[in-house]
Design a protein with these regions (language model features):
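Extreme N-terminal, non-catalytic leader segments
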Residues: 1-68
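Walker A/P-loop phosphate-binding motif and the immediately C-terminal alpha-helix
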Residues: 48, 56-95
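P-loop/Walker-type NTP enzyme "switch/lid" segment
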Residues: 91-166, 269-279
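Conserved nucleotide-binding/hydrolysis micro-motifs of P-loop NTPases
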Residues: 96-98, 141-144, 178, 200-202, ...
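Short, hinge-like loop/turn segments at secondary-structure boundaries
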Residues: 106-111, 213-214, 240-244, 280-281
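Conserved catalytic-core segment of NTP-binding enzymes
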Residues: 166, 170, 175-262
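Beta-strand-loop-alpha "switch" segments that mediate conformational coupling across diverse proteins
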Residues: 251-281, 293
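NTP-binding/hydrolysis catalytic cores, primarily Walker-type P-loop NTPases
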Residues: 275-304
Length: 304
């Protein structure tokens, strides 16, 4: 058996080969030509502006191993900061059966992704304008049909992104927490991944497990880390360095390289905005947490 990580580490003492065999191997999404079908897709220019040209939007999956780390708040506020910088941004609630982006943003939608996927509506009807200057696609809640990855869900997610990419600069996928097959497939569709964690040992352990599984089952991509709810300056950087050391030692032969996108301090303004269902960058733009998220967004753009 491989040696355990140092006892002082809050990260999980397990070797790289301890990944559960229950996790399905993930393959890269196919990018086959859909030109005939694309010609029949609705023109989204009236909602999203004229197509941008080039390769289309960057797709960023915001994910976490553990729930309750502030992943959706982080994704929404990053989107607002990017929109302030002139980017066309859309946040897609990819937690298809247990959505909460609508709760965080105090939004309601007559049409959700469920209606789009079932053909009851097209994507134009589901697009909503979010506070902060970005667009959102909201999902449903309590929908058991999205608890497992089916061929239909795979196909609908992939084609939806192909439809949206030409019109946007950045698409943020707000995934569910954990390592379900739906979460892993959603992450596989992204160009880059942001793992959100907190200094809590269980959150760090789950972040480590998430990174390990992505490294083992998916293609290499830029991998960002954001440490939320830190208690002191520099805590996030120290935890990121510690996490990288554990990856270097136990995940091989070529361990993933983490890029620390930022650390967000514990801030009462965040709790106030959560309770009021308000966007932090809109309601408390000068708060320490909002400033940290704005800095993280600028680093994300610099990494493009």
């Amino acid at each position: 058996m491989s040696p355990r990580p140092p006892a002082v580490s809050p990260l999980p003492p397990q070797p790289a080969d301890a990944v559960s065999s229950d996790v399905p191997p993930m393959t890269d999404p196919t990018h086959d030509s859909l030109s005939a079908e694309a010609a029949a897709w609705p023109d989204l220019s009236d909602r999203l502006g004229r197509p941008r040209g080039g390769d289309g939007a960057r797709v960023l999956a915001v994910t976490s191993g553990k729930g309750g780390v502030g992943k959706t708040q982080v994704g929404a506020n990053l989107a607002a900061a990017l929109a302030r910088g002139g980017q066309r941004v859309l946040v897609l609630d990819a937690d298809l059966g247990l959505a909460n982006l609508d709760v965080v943003l105090n939004l309601s939608a007559r049409i959700t992704l469920h209606q789009v996927f079932t053909g009851e509506a097209d994507v134009r009807e589901a697009l909503v304008d979010a506070p902060g200057g970005f667009h959102a696609l909201l999902a449903g809640s309590g929908l058991v049909e999205y608890s497992r990855l089916t061929p239909e869900v795979r196909d609908r997610l992939q084609r939806l992104l192909q439809q949206l990419r030409p019109y946007l600069d950045v698409i943020v996928l707000d995934t569910g927490a954990g390592l379900s097959d739906v979460v892993l497939y959603t992450v596989s569709l992204a160009d880059e991944v942001l793992v959100v964690t907190t200094p809590e040992p269980t959150a760090l352990a789950d972040a480590y497990a998430t990174i390990k599984v992505l490294d083992r089952h998916q293609r290499p991509r830029p991998l960002h880390l954001l440490v939320n709810q830190v208690q002191r300056a520099g805590e996030g950087a120290a935890l990121a360095a510690q996490l990288q050391q554990v990856l270097d030692r136990y995940v091989g032969p070529r361990p993933p390289r983490l890029r620390l996108l930022g650390e967000v301090p514990s801030d009462t303004a965040v709790r106030d905005c959560v309770l009021r269902r308000q966007l932090l960058l809109e309601q408390a733009p000068g708060s320490p947490a909002a400033l940290a998220l704005a800095l993280a967004a600028s680093r994300l753009m610099a990494a493009a």
